[in-house]
């Protein structure tokens, strides 16, 4: 993706902003953020930034708003490149503009579909098809990377950002494709392979051979080195922590967490005695209106104490910062450009961040640091390694 982005945009420097230890599907990442940042740097990224956890495990809308606000705040970004199943920027832009405007006809069809029991994604597709009389737009909205791309475009428009968008068409496999292909497989397929490996002290040779056709050598080497030392991590590793949170929360307080509706809160309370694991509970709570990923994100928000009030405060105060996870030593000119042009704080050392941040941004960073410490504690317990706090982690230099 990085090399193709350079070709498409003509850029010679690339800043990657990525989820930290928790990702948008509402689960912990299989590999830690530092391992994945190292991969990105080995494969051509100049600088890797961490998207705060309140955005990284949020809906596509908030995920995109968070990412674009950071990139726009750097003041030195001239292009944004994202992958999409559609690959047609004109089509994605036209849908983004329509959804931003939310004309009366669209809102009417959306509300009608929601009242008829459709989930929000399905209702939005149906409303768009009704309004345009064309199934193509709703087909575009049925693919997750298209949805995220549209949200990036909406966020750029909302911020009146000068950043120029580009999109790369995802080839060979879709986001939800769980089978490996000869040339290029989805992250879901690679994740499935890793999570289905029986307990083993080393990454099995046959799996390494399979993955060598899918991943660059540096990325595969990191997985091999980290295997059974700090990865793989899965949602069920957090089951006991989540069960404690669900049992300790009174019924009336669950709705304060981001994405937890009254309907979902009631289902959690009614079914929490049947809790066996994180994944099992998501499946148990799932309905036609409540998708698995929506439930998974909601439970993660409860676990990490991310509230709706937090999100409103972050949005209302337009608070943001750029936390650097790593950089290439020969691309320090990018760091200088960020320092010279950024309108948001650049965080390199957590211990020195307090004086740079507003109260809301400080809470956002502390929330992210707590979430990473929780992730690290799970790794420490699962693999029997010493705990290393977020304060102790060093910036990766390649």
Question: Predicted regions span which residues?
Answer:
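N-terminal catalytic cores of NTP/NDP-binding nucleotidyl/phosphoryl-transfer enzymes
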Residues: 1-36
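Conserved acidic residues
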Residues: 12, 46, 77-78
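Active-site cores that bind ATP or allylic diphosphates and position pyrophosphate for catalysis
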Residues: 51-398
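A broad structural signal for alpha-helix termini and local helix breaks/kinks
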Residues: 9, 44, 157-160
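Non-catalytic positions within long, well-ordered alpha-helices that form the structural scaffold/packing
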Residues: 6-7, 41, 68, 72-73
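A glycine-rich helix N-cap at a beta->alpha junction
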Residues: 38-52
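Acidic/glycine-enriched edge-of-secondary-structure segments
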Residues: 22-28, 50-57
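Class I S-adenosyl-L-methionine
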Residues: 6, 37-41, 154, 191
């Amino acid at each position: 993706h990085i090399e193709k982005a350079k070709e498409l945009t003509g850029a010679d420097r690339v800043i990657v902003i990525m989820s930290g230890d928790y990702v948008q599907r509402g689960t912990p990442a299989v590999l830690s953020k530092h391992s994945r940042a190292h991969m990105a740097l080995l494969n051509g990224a100049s600088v890797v930034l961490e998207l705060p956890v309140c955005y990284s495990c949020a809906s596509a809308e908030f995920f995109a708003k968070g990412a674009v606000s950071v990139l726009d705040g750097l003041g030195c970004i001239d292009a944004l490149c994202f992958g999409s199943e559609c690959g047609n920027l004109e089509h994605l832009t036209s849908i983004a503009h329509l959804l931003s405007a939310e004309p009366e006809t669209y809102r009417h069809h959306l509300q009608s579909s929601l009242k008829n029991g459709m989930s929000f994604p399905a209702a939005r597709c149906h409303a768009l098809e009704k309004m345009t009389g064309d199934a193509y737009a709703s087909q575009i909205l049925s693919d997750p990377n298209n949805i995220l791309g549209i949200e990036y475009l909406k966020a750029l428009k909302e911020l009146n950002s000068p950043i120029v968008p580009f999109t790369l068409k995802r080839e060979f496999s879709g986001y939800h494709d769980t089978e490996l292909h000869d040339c290029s497989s989805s992250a879901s397929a690679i994740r499935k392979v890793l999570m289905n490996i029986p307990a083993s002290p080393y990454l099995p040779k046959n799996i390494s051979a399979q993955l060598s056709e899918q991943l660059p050598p540096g990325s595969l080497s990191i997985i091999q080195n980290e295997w059974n030392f700090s990865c793989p991590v899965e949602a069920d590793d957090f089951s006991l922590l989540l069960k404690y949170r669900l049992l300790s929360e009174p019924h009336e307080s669950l709705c304060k967490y981001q994405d937890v509706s009254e309907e979902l809160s009631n289902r959690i309370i009614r079914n929490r005695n049947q809790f066996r694991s994180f994944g099992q509970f998501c499946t148990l709570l799932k309905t036609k209106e409540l998708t698995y990923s929506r439930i998974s994100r909601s439970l993660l928000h409860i676990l990490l104490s991310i509230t709706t009030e937090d999100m409103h405060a972050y949005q209302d105060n337009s608070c943001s910062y750029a936390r650097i996870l790593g950089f290439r030593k020969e691309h320090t000119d990018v760091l200088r450009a960020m320092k010279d042009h950024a309108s948001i704080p650049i965080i390199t050392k957590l211990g020195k961040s307090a004086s740079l941040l507003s109260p809301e941004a400080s809470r956002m960073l502390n929330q992210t640091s707590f979430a990473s410490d929780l992730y690290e504690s799970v790794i420490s317990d699962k693999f029997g390694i010493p705990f290393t706090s977020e304060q102790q982690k060093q910036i990766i230099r390649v």
